[in-house]
Swiss-Prot record:
Cysteine disulfide partners in this protein: none
Positions of the catalytic residues: 525 (for mutarotase activity)
Keywords: Carbohydrate metabolism, Galactose metabolism, Isomerase, Multifunctional enzyme, NAD
Any single biological process term in GO: galactose metabolic process
CDD domains: galactose_mutarotase_like, UDP_G4E_1_SDR_e
E.C. number: 5.1.3.2, 5.1.3.3
Induction (UniProt): By galactose.
Family note: In the N-terminal section; belongs to the NAD(P)-dependent epimerase/dehydratase family.
Protein name (database record): Bifunctional protein GAL10
UniProt keyword Iron present: no
Gene that encodes the chain: GAL10
Binding site for NAD(+): 6-37
Region span, Galactowaldenase: 1-346
């Protein structure tokens, strides 16, 4: 069993659950998300990781299956539970009531059984204002207090009330259990970052996501059900609460249970203010900057005039109140909708497990799938696993995570960092302090960060977006946990795939996580073989460089301080150099002519390397903002039963070799807290 304490969040990949996980993480809790993904997506979990900068453990489990749930409780020290999982559509529940009763109630029974057998005593339950039914049938019950008699009118609400009763009965039998029952009203909005939000599958059941889909062009018009109610504009009044406020309410309830053990109590979560349907329509139109069509139709069965919450109990006891109004919710929802018009479901994107089946932290995500330019990326090392051009793979790649973790892997496609290339004797000085890294037994230096290398680390994410039909982006993030370097780095790797231009752009951005200064030099280590489908090596390909001037190096491949012409390779002004079985042998650092600085992204993306193959009728051009680029002809690439030497050629843009020990270049690789390291590179493929 793990030693760390965890908060288990069932249904944590869903709308309200995901926003609550973010609040929990930001408050210092470690979370495990359990979800069967029947009406949600794992992509929300990947996005939560980047949003919080933390690993969020995930298990795909159906609560109706007791055995895997029980094993999860065996494997982790679970301290508390937030229970969101369940079917939740009111209308659907009237069509398939038995499914709702089985899923929601049996799943909760299993959860409570596991809690009881593992001595887990705290649970925050996601109930609903639907347990009240039509509160207007009573006098003086609007706004609705927790003392209002219950009377749900649909199977969904009845399952919620039944679960509440189960918890009250369990608490009556064992006062060591603590239950916070949260009855909330109408959640709206999205996280202000636009990274997570509501992603309804099919036709939205709720007003705001339906309006958003009309505004973005996915649906023709909005339907308003009735305008003859006794309200200011004739439409029903509801209590709309920003989902971030709602998530913070769950955090407040959990803290209450931690403070007052043995509690079993209900709290309304709402704003206490009513908004009509047309008032909400106008607020949303103000947020998006234009009006869209709506049509008034007949009243909907079961709708009542006013369902507004009385929230005094939550304000007084949980010390919680809403801070975000409906206008802010509309603004945040529109940002989410614009950034993610189809939610988490993105055309041209596919993901598969890369490690053990069911390990969602290790996936390969394909961008541009179904086009003539597809890029496959892995969490491990934020690695470029494959680039497929016109249906053919053009890079050296391996089959799975195990092969990439093997010591024989020559960093194929990996993000190399936190410090690429060589550091002499594995030592350097920052702010008067001498740093010593674990050196290589072969030459006594450190290459590609040695034991600290990113290529074997699991990156969080990715956040995948599709801003244009032919463009996809994927953001990966890694925050150093333990490192021999003097400070931890938080590194963002952003891939951008343009299937029309057949270009892959990579952007790196690093900041110190905390205090101090450290070395930073991050790049990619992809090996190209444009004729891979016909030829096992790069024999027959042709290469050119922007300049064949490079750093002179000693027998340990460390710079002497002089520049040298490497005439065995052609420049852009010459006829390209043809690669044979043995010549040329390249493992040199060439200069691009671009300035060396801490963040080079303001420099122009400059072509520095071209590789072509006439048989494949293909060329790749590497462009960079960096001052140097290392070129390897792969003479020591020998992966048993997979690849032989010269299986690919690598162009690795970066800073000067051993810059951290050179006064002239040191400022370009020493990153202090509060400043930013960055650079860009691109791979563009063209048909000859």
């Amino acid at each position: 069993m793990s030693e760390d304490k965890y908060c288990l969040v069932t249904g944590g990949a869903g709308y309200i659950g995901s926003h609550t996980v973010v609040e929990l993480c930001e408050a210092g809790y470690k979370c495990i998300v359990v979800d069967n993904l029947s009406n949600s997506s794992y992509e929300s979990v990947a996005r939560m990781e980047l949003l919080t900068g933390q690993e969020i453990k995930f298990a795909k489990i159906d609560l109706c299956e007791l055995e895997p749930l029980n094993k999860l409780f065996d494997d982790y020290k679970i301290d508390s539970v937030l229970h969101f999982a369940g079917l939740k559509a009111v209308g659907e529940s009237t069509q398939i009531p038995l499914t709702y009763y089985f899923n929601n109630i049996v799943g909760t029974i299993n959860l409570l059984e596991c809690m009881k057998s593992h001595d887990v005593k705290k649970l925050v339950f996601s109930s609903s204002a639907t347990v009240y039914g039509d509160a207007t049938r009573f006098e003086n019950m609007i706004p609705i207090p927790e003392t209002c008699p219950t009377g749900p009118t649909n199977p969904y609400g009845k399952t919620k009330l039944t679960i509440e009763d189960m918890m009250r009965d369990l608490h009556f039998s064992d006062k060591s259990f603590s239950f916070a029952i949260l009855r909330y009203f109408n959640p709206i909005g999205a996280h202000p970052s636009g990274v997570i939000g509501e992603d309804p599958l099919g036709i939205p059941n709720n007003l705001l996501p339906f309006m958003a889909q009309v505004a973005i062009g996915r649906r023709p018009k909005l339907y308003v059900f009735g305008d003859d109610y006794d309200s200011v504009d004739g439409t029903p009044i509801r209590d709309y609460i920003h989902v971030v406020d709602l998530a913070k309410g769950h955090l407040a309830a959990l803290k209450y249970l931690e403070k007052y053990a043995g509690t079993c109590r209900e709290w309304n979560l709402g704003t206490g203010h009513g908004t009509t349907v047309l008032q909400m329509y106008r607020a949303f139109c103000d947020a998006i900057g234009f009006n869209f069509e709506y049509v008034v139709t007949a009243r909907r069965d079961g709708d009542v005039l006013n369902l507004t919450a009385k929230c005094d109990r939550a304000t007084n006891e949980l010390e919680w109140k809403t801070e975000l109004d409906v206008n802010k919710a509309c603004v945040d929802l529109w940002k989410w909708t614009q950034d993610n018009p189809f939610g988490y479901q993105i055309k041209g994107v596919d993901s598969k497990f890369f490690g053990d089946k069911g390990d969602f932290s290790s996936r390969v995500v394909s961008l541009g799938k179904g086009t003539s330019f597809e890029v496959k990326l892995a969490n491990l090392g934020a690695t470029i696993v494959d680039i497929v051009v016109n249906g053919c793979s053009v890079v050296a790649s391996l089959d799975n995570e195990t092969e990439y973790k093997d010591q024989s892997n020559p960093f194929f496609g990996a993000t190399v960092g936190p410090y690429a290339n060589r550091i002499a004797n594995g030592t350097f000085e920052i702010n008067g302090k001498r740093i010593q890294l674990t050196v290589s037994k072969e030459d006594g230096n450190v290459v590609h960060s040695g034991i600290n290398s990113y290529h074997s680390k699991k990156f969080l994410g990715p956040i995948v977006k599709n801003p244009e039909a032919h463009i996809w982006t994927a953001d990966f993030k890694y925050v150093d946990e333990e490192t021999e370097f003097p400070a931890r780095l938080s590194t963002l790797v952003r891939y951008k795939v343009d299937s029309e231009k057949k270009t892959l752009t990579v952007e790196y951005e690093s900041k110190v996580a905390g205090q101090g200064s450290t070395g930073a030099n991050i790049t990619n280590h992809t090996y190209f073989n444009l004729n891979k489908f016909n030829e096992a090596t790069i024999k027959g390909s042709k290469v050119q460089l922007i300049d064949n001037t490079g750093l002179e190096v000693n027998n340990k491949l460390l710079p002497t301080g002089n520049l040298k012409k490497y005439t065995q390779v052609a420049t852009f002004n010459d006829s390209p150099t043809e690669i044979t079985e043995k010549e040329p042998v390249l493992d040199f650092c060439f200069v691009s002519g671009l300035p060396a600085k801490l963040d080079t992204r303001s420099s122009p993306l400059t072509p520095v390397f071209k590789l072509s193959n006439e048989d494949a009728k293909l060329e790749v051009e590497v462009a960079t903002t960096e001052p140097t680029f290392q070129v390897y002809t792969g003479d020591y690439v020998d992966v048993k039963d997979k690849y032989e030497n010269r299986a690919g050629i690598c162009c690795e843009p970066g800073r000067y070799i051993d810059a951290v020990n050179n006064p002239e270049w040191k400022s370009s690789v020493v990153l202090p807290a509060g400043e930013t390291y960055g650079h860009k590179l691109s791979y563009t493929f063209r048909t000859l």
